[in-house]
Amino acid sequence: MDRTLVLLKPDAVKRRLVGKIIERFEEKGLKIVAMKFMQMTKDQAKTHYSVHQNKPFFNDLVNYITSGPIVAMILEGAHAIEIVRLMSGATDGSKAQPGTIRGDYSMGIEKNIIHASDSLEAYNHEMPIFFSDNEIIEWAYGDEVIY
């Protein structure tokens, strides 16, 4: 099974969209294997966005992602990276298709609700910034209902 890192950014948290977004992933059949509510540090943000460090918008990215709490999670499933990217929609919310997370909840590129790893290499770079291996929980869906 493939895994991907997803960050629900400060605007998703502030707008109370976390539950709705997680529900979409679960309904699609993706499994949460790690999740935490956290405040990203500047150092974590700089490491996370290091591929953009020489771009003019780098400091804005760092300041925005550290402006409030986020939800970090690892989702697991067949083709998880590709599926989550499709579900997320275009990076610029004003260009994202309706029915995608950004298409439904974002109006622009700056506050665009969600980050999702765009490749296995990106996941391998990003995951250790937010999770240790012992925070990833291996589990299986059960068919029985437990009360």
Swiss-Prot record:
Tagged with keyword Glycoprotein: no
Cysteine disulfide partners in this protein: none
A single GO BP: GTP biosynthetic process
Pfam families, A to Z: NDK (PF00334)
EC number of the protein: 2.7.4.6
Coiled-coil regions listed: none
CDD domains associated with the record: NDPk_I
Keyword Nucleotide-binding: yes
Chain sites annotated for binding ATP: 9, 57, 85, 91, 102, 112
InterPro entries referenced in this protein's UniProt entry, alphabetically: NDK-like_dom (IPR034907), NDK-like_dom_sf (IPR036850), Nucleoside_diP_kinase (IPR001564), Nucleoside_diP_kinase_AS (IPR023005)
Keyword terms of this UniProt record: ATP-binding, Cytoplasm, Kinase, Magnesium, Metal-binding, Nucleotide metabolism, Nucleotide-binding, Phosphoprotein, Transferase
Gene Ontology CC: cytoplasm
EC class (word): transferase
Cofactor(s) listed in the protein's UniProt record: Mg(2+)
Catalytic residues identified in the record: 115
Family annotation (PROSITE patterns): NDPK (PS00469), NDPK_LIKE (PS51374)
MF term (GO), any: nucleoside diphosphate kinase activity
Location in or out of the cell: Cytoplasm
Catalytic activity, as annotated: a 2'-deoxyribonucleoside 5'-diphosphate + ATP = a 2'-deoxyribonucleoside 5'-triphosphate + ADP; a ribonucleoside 5'-diphosphate + ATP = a ribonucleoside 5'-triphosphate + ADP
Purpose of the protein: Major role in the synthesis of nucleoside triphosphates other than ATP. The ATP gamma phosphate is transferred to the NDP beta phosphate via a ping-pong mechanism, using a phosphorylated active-site intermediate.
Family per record: Belongs to the NDK family.
NCBIfam families cross-referenced by the UniProt entry: PRK00668.1 (NF001908)
Protein name: Nucleoside diphosphate kinase
